[in-house]
Amino acid sequence: MKEIVLAGGCFWGVEEYMSRIEGIVETKVGYANGIKENPSYEEVCSGVTGHAEACYIKYDESIISLEELLNKFWSIIDPTVLNKQGNDRGTQYRTGIFYLDEKDLNVIIKSKYQEQKNYRKPIVTEVEPLKCFYEAEEYHQKYLKKNPGGYCHIHLD
């Protein structure tokens, strides 16, 4: 099994979208690459912790490759917008690809390069090693499964 953490705006929609993909075996939402240990949702939303709302993904590489997974990720975000996705604004809504395995970096860089060909503006999606990931509060986990019709900036149909 492989792991990656993806930030694409509000984590509810990213998790719901990713959980529907064949080969994804586990998803969790949380806060990635900030400066405060174990922050609360309110602290992250204040913008002072530096965390991104993100989705931890465990996937079966024999069913879906990282390249395929990233292609699906690119399709649900606007990678040219800084600190904003849909109606959500703030540093916690930035886009990012946070890797746990250094061997994945070449695939990520190649994928970002290929995606850039679709845009005139530069892609601002961060590509960094995962420094930290704190699981979000339980009520955020599988939020759109628990609350069908809840807010989502991603078209899930």
Swiss-Prot record:
PANTHER family in the cross-refs: MITOCHONDRIAL PEPTIDE METHIONINE SULFOXIDE REDUCTASE
The protein's role, per its UniProt record: Has an important function as a repair enzyme for proteins that have been inactivated by oxidation. Catalyzes the reversible oxidation-reduction of methionine sulfoxide in proteins to methionine.
Protein name, as recorded: Peptide methionine sulfoxide reductase MsrA
Residues the record marks as active site: C10
Keywords: Oxidoreductase
A GO cellular component entry from the record: cytoplasm
A Gene Ontology molecular function term of the record: L-methionine-(S)-S-oxide reductase activity
Documented EC number(s): 1.8.4.11
Entry-linked InterPro entries: Met_Sox_Rdtase_MsrA_dom, Met_Sox_Rdtase_MsrA_sf, MsrA_MetSO_reductase
A Pfam family matched in the record: PMSR
Superkingdom classification of source: Bacteria
Species for this entry: Clostridium botulinum (strain Hall / ATCC 3502 / NCTC 13319 / Type A)
Reaction catalysed by this enzyme: L-methionyl-[protein] + [thioredoxin]-disulfide + H2O = L-methionyl-(S)-S-oxide-[protein] + [thioredoxin]-dithiol; [thioredoxin]-disulfide + L-methionine + H2O = L-methionine (S)-S-oxide + [thioredoxin]-dithiol
Signal peptide (from-to): none
Family in the record: Belongs to the MsrA Met sulfoxide reductase family.
Top-level EC class as recorded in UniProt: oxidoreductase
Gene Ontology biological-process entries: cellular response to oxidative stress; protein modification process
